[in-house]
């Protein structure tokens, strides 16, 4: 099980990302825009740099909902490989069966 502080940190990052997502997208479109004047582009770069680091989507790490494990994560189920296997074996994940050939 991951430390509670690590899980809390990820929750904080998700909240910050949600709060600043729209503003970050607007600033990035200004920066990437071909017709944007240089002064406005530089101001947008500075404004983007002043946003909190944890508000960037790349700072987020996918974690298992049950254990908080960061590796072996399956997006489709929101679980780590260990807990996914346990849930599948108990029949809690509909439509998923153990491979047999």
Curated annotation (Swiss-Prot):
Keywords: Ribonucleoprotein, Ribosomal protein, RNA-binding, rRNA-binding. Transmembrane segments: none annotated. The keyword Ion transport does not apply. One of its GO terms (biological process) is translation. GO terms for molecular function: rRNA binding; structural constituent of ribosome. One of its GO terms (cellular component) is cytoplasm. Pfam families: Ribosomal_S14. The keyword Cell wall biogenesis/degradation does not apply. Belongs to the universal ribosomal protein uS14 family. Binds 16S rRNA, required for the assembly of 30S particles and may also be responsible for determining the conformation of the 16S rRNA at the A site. NCBIfam families: PRK08881.1. Part of the 30S ribosomal subunit. Contacts proteins S3 and S10. This is Small ribosomal subunit protein uS14. It comes from Methylococcus capsulatus (strain ATCC 33009 / NCIMB 11132 / Bath).
